[in-house]
Amino acid sequence: MEPNAPPPITRWQALDKLQQAGVSVFVSMSTTYSPMGEDDFHELLSYFRALGEVVVLHEPINPRGANFQQCLTAAEQAGYDDVVEELQQVQDSHQYWVEYALEQLNTVQQVATRFDGLDVHSWPDDELVRSTSGQLRSKLTAIQQAVSPESFSTRATDASPEQSELARDGESIDHLI
């Protein structure tokens, strides 16, 4: 769905080659689209973990971002009607987008706990943070401000406690919204 981008397998092969050459790599899993769910994230994170110990940078799609319309157009041209419908809902309803983005952030962090040596650094959008309050806003702000743990940085590489799921496995995030 990314116009002019190399296929995912080509990107993965390039990352694998770099990793094998001893170059520290990170993966941008950004942006993720609303039809993506737990199984999709598990598959992606499995590929990324196969590269070794990597940092995955994650951000749900933002309907205000420049690439949103490109993705919508690409989905329409590819005939992905279910994706088009979902993206339209994300674009048309602020509350729908907030709930979708929170669910995506939470699901990715939950799935990431299944993989040793895989750090996911989430990027909640400023508008998402502003659209929340209380404990949830505090948690999202902490996630935003956490330093990503790339091993080539001068900071220790332990996973940041701020970069964790919003709710535990099987627990709904509805009580936080």
Locate each region found by the language model.
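Conserved AdoMet/S-adenosylmethionine-binding subsite of the radical SAM
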Residues: 1-100
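C-terminal accessory extensions appended to soluble enzyme cores
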Residues: 71-177
